[in-house]
Amino acid sequence: KGGLMNQNKLFMESLVGIFTANQGKIKLLLMRKKSEPYKGYWVLPGEFLKIDESLEENVSRVINQLGLPDMYFEQVNTFSDVSHYEKSRVVATSYLALVDIMTLKLKQEERKVEMEWFDINEIPKLGYDHNLIVSELIKTLKQRIINSNILKILFPSDFALPELQKIYESVLN
């Protein structure tokens, strides 16, 4: 029988760009992929959507699995290029997440995944189409910094003004 529903299997995933401010620079959390395809490449944290969860619940699950505290996040874009994944049809929704460096505690040893913070001006070649997605996330972050008070989320209440100036210079070149 088959039918249209069986022919069009589609997977949804959330990809989370988690940013923080550290030593006057904006950093992005990436994780190293342990399996093919793109084994050894850095990628954005993400998970496939479960049938019984919303995208927002999925993002919260990703953040929780990383051992991070609850944080601000917002939906940025949806990527539906048919070549996003080689063997499956996957639609990815990207999220911009911000966390204050003082509240960070990565449970890396529990997750058994290699993670690292990268300066947004020094992002390596990433797996899949994640460089495109990261570019969109950084562009959105820059717009938010210019047009809102979103940077307050990245700093503890006792941050120094020169550090804020360094962040603006780093992000806005």
Feature names for model-found ranges:
Residues 6, 10-14, 27, 56-60, ...:
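Active-site segment of metal-dependent pyrophosphate-handling enzymes
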Residues 147-158, 171:
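Conserved helix-adjacent loop modules within structured domains
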Residues 5-42:
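N-terminal strand-loop-strand
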Residues 46-47:
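Short, compositionally biased serine/threonine- and acidic-rich segments at solvent-exposed termini, linkers
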Residues 37-42, 138-150, 161:
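A eukaryotic nuclear recognition-module signature that targets compact all-alpha binding cores
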Residues 96, 106-141, 154-165:
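NUDIX/MutT-family hydrolases
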